[in-house]
Amino acid sequence: MNHELPVISLFSGAGGLDCAIESCAEPPLVQDGSGSPLRVAVATDYEQTALDTLSANFPHTKTLCGDIQTIPTAELLEAGGLKPGDPTLVIGGPPCTPFSKSGFWIEEKRNSADPNASLLDEYVRVVRESKPEAFILENVQGLTYKTHQAQFDRLIAGLKDAGYNPTFRVLLAAEYGVPQLRRRVFVVGRRDGKAFHFPETTHSGESERDRVIDHTKIPFTSLREALAGLPDVPEAGEVVEGTYAELAAEVPPGQNYLWHTDRYGGRNEFKWRSRYWTFLLKADPDRPSTTLQAQPGPWVGPFHWENVKNANGEERARRFRVAEMKRIMTFPDEFVFTGVKREVQRQIGNPVPVELGKVVVRALMEQLGYLDSRGTTIPSQAGHEQLELI
């Protein structure tokens, strides 16, 4: 083994958490090329397009495409040039549809009967058999809901049985400087039995649940701040057309379809609370974005707060462009996405925001003794191969 600390990445997608892994030595919210002592040795996903994106950005990472249920842990280790006990971390976010709001209306998903829910067991299997020093699992907060308690309890029990001490917490990305009101649950565990301590929040502002602002912290990062400096380059398919095109264009920034009810100033087209909150939702430039979705419907926001003209000169709402979505998800501007727009939207909308992942990875690496509080690699920990299994 070389001095780089190897990581196994499961359900990698386009590499959001992988990007956090390979930049964790950078200060929070800074992309200065400081790098990381960690390197993703091998990554898996069932979508080749997502792995093409990952390979375009991390050419040193070996990739395996396929259903994780058919990939033995030994094959993962071999692809990464590893043996049990070698990986510093196992990371990943199993497909979240069974636990997300977007899939909640399907009864089998409410009850965690969706086949994808069993992928949590596959994550536990790889952790148990590869014996990393620690692991990070992330998912939508819906995984912690009472409707999924049996599945979540099974996950925690499995990780404990594998010899780890898992702790979990739902984190709001905006509270760590990400320009998005996106909540993700993180489950983190160490093989040495010590508990992981989650990093303190650094930012404060109004969210969909909290109107109390802590003025001792940094204000939330607004969309206007996050998207500043991007060139105004139109993209194909960005104009919102169809049945509700005119209504979407008339919605003010920060409002949604409720603008067109009898309680607000628009047309009286909809009944109060008859649609999803994201229906015809227009972003507020002075606040963080609401959650970007991986597979939004044609009239599902958030849309950009500024309208554009269509080919006929009519005013229309527009969707966020790829460069803008990368900023909202805190991917580096130079990060390359492969595939058609629909595939890119899914790749950007699925992962944890990079900077949210980075603060968790950085905290774990500090607590394991690989980084100091400034993000500097501690030389005495370079001999990772000397660590013994517990």
UniProtKB/Swiss-Prot annotation:
Native organism taxonomy: Bacteria, Bacillati, Actinomycetota, Actinomycetes, Kitasatosporales
Matching Pfam families? DNA_methylase (PF00145)
What would you give as a GO molecular function for this chain, any one? Answer: DNA (cytosine-5-)-methyltransferase activity
Q: What is its EC number?
A: 2.1.1.37
Instruction: Please give the NCBIfam families that the UniProt record associates with this protein.
Output: dcm
Catalytic reaction list: a 2'-deoxycytidine in DNA + S-adenosyl-L-methionine = a 5-methyl-2'-deoxycytidine in DNA + S-adenosyl-L-homocysteine + H(+)
The name on file for this protein is Type II methyltransferase M.SacI
**What keywords were assigned to this record?**
DNA-binding, Methyltransferase, Restriction system, S-adenosyl-L-methionine, Transferase
Q: Where is the SAM-dependent MTase C5-type domain?
A: 5-371
Which residues of this protein are catalytic?
A: 96
Q: InterPro entries, from UniProt?
A: C5-Methyltransferase, C5_MeTfrase, SAM-dependent_MTases_sf
Matching PANTHER family, A to Z? CYTOSINE-SPECIFIC METHYLTRANSFERASE, DNA (CYTOSINE-5)-METHYLTRANSFERASE 1
UniProt record similarity statement: Belongs to the class I-like SAM-binding methyltransferase superfamily. C5-methyltransferase family.
Return the Gene3D superfamilies for the record: DNA Methylase, subunit A, domain 2, Vaccinia Virus protein VP39
GO BP annotation list? DNA restriction-modification system; methylation; negative regulation of gene expression via chromosomal CpG island methylation
This protein's record includes keyword DNA-binding: yes
Source organism per UniProt: Streptomyces achromogenes
Record flagged with keyword DNA-binding = yes
